[in-house]
Amino acid sequence: MKVGIDAGGTLIKIIQEQDNQRTFKTELTKNIDQVVEWLNQQQIEKLCLTGGNAGVIAENINIPAQIFVEFDAASQGLGILLKEQGHDLADYIFANVGTGTSLHYFDGQSQRRVGGIGTGGGMIQGLGYLLSQITDYKQLTDMAQHGDRNTIDLKVRHIYKDTEPPIPGDLTAANFGHVLHHLDADFTPSNKLAAVIGVVGEVVTTMAITVAREFKTENIVYIGSSFHNNALLRKVVEDYTVLRGCKPYYVENGAFSGAIGALYLEK
């Protein structure tokens, strides 16, 4: 069995390959000792690690492991997944939306990191908790899917009520900027959480589009653990990317790009 692991700040992503079959699993980083114990019980032919906590795992296992830079691993794994899922892109920006967000440009040969922002899954969980008192990520994202942002976010069309706006009316003019106009509204937890996911998705997309224009590509690929159980975030980034004139791509199992890539990089 071959194992690739991306040990991130919040989640540990694990892929196992055996008999041409690939299986995926995740574990919370706070349970890293359990992952180490599991690894020490397996018959592993090849073990490759990446991510901020890769060194912690390597120091506590009884089998040899190779460690790779997470940006290179993510790019390698993403290329594999894009090919497997039928996407033939000459170049692209990829946004890895984990606890925070890292932005990269792939020119057809190699990747380079071109930016990063603190907006991502950490904001969804942290700000989401402050607004709802919900700590469980699945419960939080489940609730957000049914939310309505209309009384919370100020859209361009809300400003240009009787006039044709100079930019698309569905663009957000101010996240949470409509709240004071609707103080009599019922701001349900679902609505507030949907607005949190909205601002995360729009900030990530805006930054991705900015660097895409800088590098003269229209292709933006979105990956990362923040999309898990979060159809709303995927819809926000896809719709907003199209609205801003670029082409969005979502990759199934994209959160495992680093784990897959580590397994296929060679030292």
UniProtKB/Swiss-Prot annotation:
Alphabetical keyword list: ATP-binding, Coenzyme A biosynthesis, Cytoplasm, Kinase, Nucleotide-binding, Transferase
Catalytic residues as annotated in Swiss-Prot or TrEMBL: 70 (proton acceptor)
A Gene Ontology term for the protein's cellular component: cytosol
Group of enzyme by EC: transferase
Coiled coil: none
Transport in keyword set: no
GO molecular function, one term: pantothenate kinase activity
Catalytic activity, EC: 2.7.1.33
Gene3D superfamilies: 3.30.420.40
Subcellular localization, as worded in the UniProt entry: Cytoplasm
UniProt: ATP binding residues: 6-13, 99, 121-125, 137, 225
Annotated catalysed reactions: (R)-pantothenate + ATP = (R)-4'-phosphopantothenate + ADP + H(+)
Functional pathway: Cofactor biosynthesis; coenzyme A biosynthesis; CoA from (R)-pantothenate: step 1/5
GO biological process: coenzyme A biosynthetic process
Family listed: Belongs to the type II pantothenate kinase family.
PANTHER family reported in the protein's UniProt record: 4'-PHOSPHOPANTETHEINE PHOSPHATASE (PTHR12280:SF20), PANTOTHENATE KINASE (PTHR12280)
Subunit structure: Homodimer.
Role noted for this protein: Catalyzes the phosphorylation of pantothenate (Pan), the first step in CoA biosynthesis.
Name this polypeptide is given: Type II pantothenate kinase
Organism: Staphylococcus aureus (strain bovine RF122 / ET3-1)
